[in-house]
Amino acid sequence: VKNKSVGIYLTNHQINVNILKTLDKEKNDFDYVYVKLHPHIKKTEDLYQYGLKIVQSNIMVEFLILILLDNGNKLSVFHENSTSVIWFQDRIINKNMGQPFEEYDIVASYIQSKEL
């Protein structure tokens, strides 16, 4: 995938159906929409009703994000307080759908303030 608009949902140990519903509503805003499953998730049949592409791999999501960005894609990342996206805050559209979590905000702010 190169030079496209991509939405990707990074699941936690459980799949948040509300995020799937949001992606289902917004999928026409993207050329591609992916769900990157947490490696512990094995059951996927319920996901196919949303028409989203499933990435079921043990590859670290940071590598997937980096590959998508390096190929010139505009990337919107939907997640729930995932620290995986912190390193890419200046290069992605960060859609944190998680509950407020003070420690996450502190870490994200600290990393964003540094020139890495």
Describe the predicted segments one by one.
Residues 40-89:
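Donor nucleotide-activated moiety binding/catalytic core segment of transferases
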Residues 84-116:
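Catalytic binding pocket for nucleotide-activated donors in carbohydrate/polymer assembly enzymes
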Residues 4-9, 30-35, 73-78, 92-97:
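Hydrophobic beta-strand segments of well-ordered beta-sheets in folded domains
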Residues 21-29, 67-71:
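Short, basic/hydrophobic alpha-helical segments
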Residues 15-19, 41-47, 102-107:
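Short, charged/polar "capping" segments at the starts of alpha-helices
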Residues 25-37, 49-59, 91-95, 115-116:
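Structural alpha-beta junctions
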Residues 2-4, 67-75, 108-115:
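Short, surface-exposed amphipathic charged segments that create phosphate/polyanion-binding patches used
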Residues 1-23, 31-41:
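Active-site donor-nucleotide binding/catalytic segment of nucleotide-sugar enzymes
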